[in-house]
Amino acid sequence: MTSLVSLENVSVSFGQRRVLSDVSLELKPGKILTLLGPNGAGKSTLVRVVLGLVTPDEGVIKRNGKLRIGYVPQKLYLDTTLPLTVNRFLRLRPGTHKEDILPALKRVQAGHLINAPMQKLSGGETQRVLLARALLNRPQLLVLDEPTQGVDVNGQVALYDLIDQLRRELDCGVLMVSHDLHLVMAKTDEVLCLNHHICCSGTPEVVSLHPEFISMFGPRGAEQLGIYRHHHNHRHDLQGRIVLRRGNDRS
């Protein structure tokens, strides 16, 4: 399968500070890669490398031709005094045709929000509008920077269901950054744990049959949510230095 984007041993430094060290990954059509890591681990920098906004000091980046990327940012800052409807917000995107706006909103089950004020949207509604905006250029790759931040569990389940539906319909790759170190989208194909370098990688644990999980999140939540168990052979001290463990640590 041809990669949309591949990174090979990519490193990035800002001044004397090494932010990313020897990071490698592949983003493929129809596949979801979830990136986990603590605050300050370099996740946002890695996203900017994938988007082409940061040039690495070392390593190789390969992109598939004229790759179309749809990006959903971590946060949206709007002037609360500025009257701005969803329709107007989406039309601000360069190259957008007004006849494409409602179909994009309907695709993310948000057609009813077209005339709603942006400032009045809930966290989940805002994420759907941003996702609709990302779909306007018919992306081959969706980059979602913490799409479930500020969204309750039911909203997370609905968003994960929608993301899975979109990747199947569009056959697009998905890079998703998560602020939760353990709870991830169950249908993720690969999970990478980042702390300036790749600490570990794997797949989510199937938990849909666990009675405790079903009772906590319901049948639909158990289907869409998964647990990622880390398997590190090291830890990071307070200065960020790597300290090797005697045996693999799972958490």
Curated annotation (Swiss-Prot):
Activity control, as annotated, is:
Inhibited by arsenate.
Write out the residues that bind ATP.
Answer: G37, P38, N39, G40, A41, G42, K43, S44
**Keywords tagged on the record:** ATP-binding, Cell inner membrane, Cell membrane, Ion transport, Membrane, Nucleotide-binding, Translocase, Transport, Zinc, Zinc transport
What the entry lists under Gene3D superfamilies is as follows:
P-loop containing nucleotide triphosphate hydrolases
CDD domains named among the record's database cross-references? ABC_Metallic_Cations
What Gene Ontology terms for biological process does this UniProt record contain? response to zinc ion; zinc ion import across plasma membrane
User: What residues does the ABC transporter domain cover?
Assistant: 5-220
Q: Name one Pfam family in it.
A: ABC_tran
Locations listed in the record: Cell inner membrane
Per the record, its GO cellular-component terms are: ATP-binding cassette (ABC) transporter complex; ATP-binding cassette (ABC) transporter complex, substrate-binding subunit-containing; membrane
Reactions that this protein is recorded to catalyse: Zn(2+)(out) + ATP(in) + H2O(in) = Zn(2+)(in) + ADP(in) + phosphate(in) + H(+)(in)
An example molecular function term from Gene Ontology annotations: ABC-type zinc transporter activity
Recorded hits in PROSITE patterns, A to Z, give: ABC_TRANSPORTER_2, ZNUC
Q: What class of enzyme is it?
A: translocase
Q: How does it assemble?
A: The complex is composed of two ATP-binding proteins (ZnuC), two transmembrane proteins (ZnuB) and a solute-binding protein (ZnuA).
Cross-referenced NCBIfam families, in alphabetical order?
Answer: PRK09544.1 (NF007090)
Family designation? Belongs to the ABC transporter superfamily. Zinc importer (TC 3.A.1.15.5) family.
What this chain does, per the record? Part of the ABC transporter complex ZnuABC involved in zinc import. Responsible for energy coupling to the transport system.
What's the name of the protein?
Zinc import ATP-binding protein ZnuC
Recall the taxonomic lineage recorded for the source organism: Bacteria, Pseudomonadati, Pseudomonadota, Gammaproteobacteria, Enterobacterales
